[in-house]
Amino acid sequence: MGCVFCKKLEPASKEDVGLEGDFRSQTAEERYFPDPTQGRTSSVFPQPTSPAFLNTGNMRSISGTGVTIFVALYDYEARTGDDLTFTKGEKFHILNNTEYDWWEARSLSSGHRGYVPSNYVAPVDSIQAEEWYFGKISRKDAERQLLSSGNPQGAFLIRESETTKGAYSLSIRDWDQNRGDHIKHYKIRKLDTGGYYITTRAQFDSIQDLVRHYMEVNDGLCYLLTAPCTTTKPQTLGLAKDAWEIDRNSIALERRLGTGCFGDVWLGTWNCSTKVAVKTLKPGTMSPKAFLEEAQIMKLLRHDKLVQLYAVVSEEPIYIVTEFMCYGSLLDFLKDREGQNLMLPHLVDMAAQVAEGMAYMERMNYIHRDLRAANILVGEYLICKIADFGLARLIEDNEYNPQQGTKFPIKWTAPEAALFGRFTVKSDVWSFGILLTELITKGRVPYPGMNNREVLEQVEHGYHMPCPPGCPASLYEVMEQAWRLDPEERPTFEYLQSFLEDYFTSTEPQYQPGDQT
């Protein structure tokens, strides 16, 4: 990620000369078109055709390799009678891996047969089975993970190169008096003969040999490799095999986490085994049939910056079962003591994570429609994930109406969406600009002192919120770009992600020279 995108995707200049006049002179039909996803069904949404579609950041599953003996990367406790309980290091014979999420396996130690989550296992003796191998994660996520608590100087990981297919990168946590803790990255290059090297004077037959060498001597690296980066067990891809439409009685609602206009959010347990979050919708909020169709699409959206949809109860009252995020909504988090103490680098990083998730949705041509801090969830290590994507389109409540309803999020909604129902990725970009103000102000309601009608009238005439106190001018400029009246002049989420990820990047090269001393 980084500077390459910034240069390629630089949005138009700041001045919108004549834009307001053009906006006002056109008719609604000339300016806007109907919501392109109205009436869409799951049959026209991109289907998962390969593991690449379902990549969730640090997923380690392997398919199509011909390897049938796999090793467990983590402990796992069976959730159903069809699952296998296993411990880290246990070996399996994979019997059937035709379904991507859950594979049928037989334990070589116990002889028991059942299903295992595919992202909890890897081929024996492969690079994917190594604790230091993190697979297809971004450079920025590598930095986030290595800078988290518990990692000493010299903590490291190896990941797939973002720029060179088939190559790898080594990321190391370092420290010095001037910069404190920071991360350095090294390219691992591949020889034509099949070996690997960082510097030509030290070549190795395998990545494992390379790691063993640099754990014994730094040999030109910034620091000796001391320990693999700490990690937590990933979310399984779904609750269990075929656990999609589930029985309401399999969910125990334990503690109410929040209440909204259309229902409540609970901490719950599925099948007496798995902690989950459960959104319960009031009867009449949306059509169960329409919800189930949309949910079939939503479950195909998989990215580590999107809250994973686990399962549904499709009869009223509808239950939406998702992964549990320990700190709740970003809005509530910003308002409490820990959120109030966050500094600008933390806030910008949280914004970058949201932009990353939205960039994925942009690539998938999926529209959120209700992007705001209340619909971003926060987990350990300040990980942010996007929630409630796509649900706003299904709400049937008369009060959820931009013209007169009190429940519609006018202050976050682009004018073309609020006035004419023109929801697009670009209207999500507008909402992201408003979300940036929520971050900078630690949860302040947008457009303070203005009601919804005033906001709609003023925004249509080109009004922008002034720069929030303490907000850098360069960040406010991005907000203003997101609020351009012409949707096509707003930046892409790909650009926003790159801009925010590189916001504090110094002038040092992205990768360290392999021969540095």
Swiss-Prot record:
* Pfam families hit by this protein: PK_Tyr_Ser-Thr, SH2, SH3_1
Q: Which Gene3D superfamilies match?
A: Phosphorylase Kinase, domain 1 (3.30.200.20), SH2 domain (3.30.505.10), SH3 Domains (2.30.30.40), Transferase(Phosphotransferase) domain 1 (1.10.510.10)
Observed phenotype of the null mutant: No visible phenotype. Mice lacking both Fgr and Hck are normal and fertile, but show increased susceptibility to infection with Listeria monocytogenes. In addition, their polymorphonuclear leukocytes show defects in cell spreading and adhesion.
GO CC annotations? aggresome; cytoskeleton; cytosol; mitochondrial inner membrane; mitochondrial intermembrane space; plasma membrane; ruffle membrane
Q: Where is the lipid attached (N-myristoyl glycine)?
A: 2
- What is this protein's tissue specificity according to the annotation? Expressed in natural killer cells (at protein level).
Q: Which residues bind ATP?
A: 257-265, 279
Major place of residence: membrane
What UniProt keywords apply to this chain's record, in alphabetical order? ATP-binding, Cell membrane, Cell projection, Cytoplasm, Cytoskeleton, Immunity, Innate immunity, Kinase, Lipoprotein, Membrane, Mitochondrion, Mitochondrion inner membrane, Myristate, Nucleotide-binding, Palmitate, Phosphoprotein, Proto-oncogene, SH2 domain, SH3 domain, Transferase, Tyrosine-protein kinase, Ubl conjugation
- GO BP, one annotated term: positive regulation of mast cell degranulation
| Residue ranges annotated for the SH3 domain, each copy included | 65-126
Q: How does it sit in the membrane?
A: Lipid-anchor; Peripheral membrane protein
Which sites are catalytic?
370
Known post-translational modifications?
Ubiquitinated. Becomes ubiquitinated in response to ITGB2 signaling; this does not lead to degradation. Phosphorylated. Autophosphorylated on tyrosine residues. Becomes phosphorylated in response to FCGR2 engagement, cell adhesion and signaling by ITGB2. Prior phosphorylation at Tyr-511 by SRC inhibits ulterior autophosphorylation at Tyr-400.
Q: Where do the SH2 domain residues begin and end?
A: 132-229
* Sites bearing Phosphoserine, chain numbering: 13, 50, 206
Q: Does the keyword Signal apply?
A: no
Keyword Cell membrane assigned: yes
As for subcellular location, the record says:
Cell membrane; Cell projection, Ruffle membrane; Cytoplasm, Cytosol; Cytoplasm, Cytoskeleton
| One term of GO molecular function | ATP binding
Recorded catalytic activity of this chain's protein: L-tyrosyl-[protein] + ATP = O-phospho-L-tyrosyl-[protein] + ADP + H(+)
Q: Tell me which residues make up the Protein kinase domain.
A: 251-504
Instruction: Name the protein family.
Output: Belongs to the protein kinase superfamily. Tyr protein kinase family. SRC subfamily.
Protein's name according to its UniProt entry = Tyrosine-protein kinase Fgr
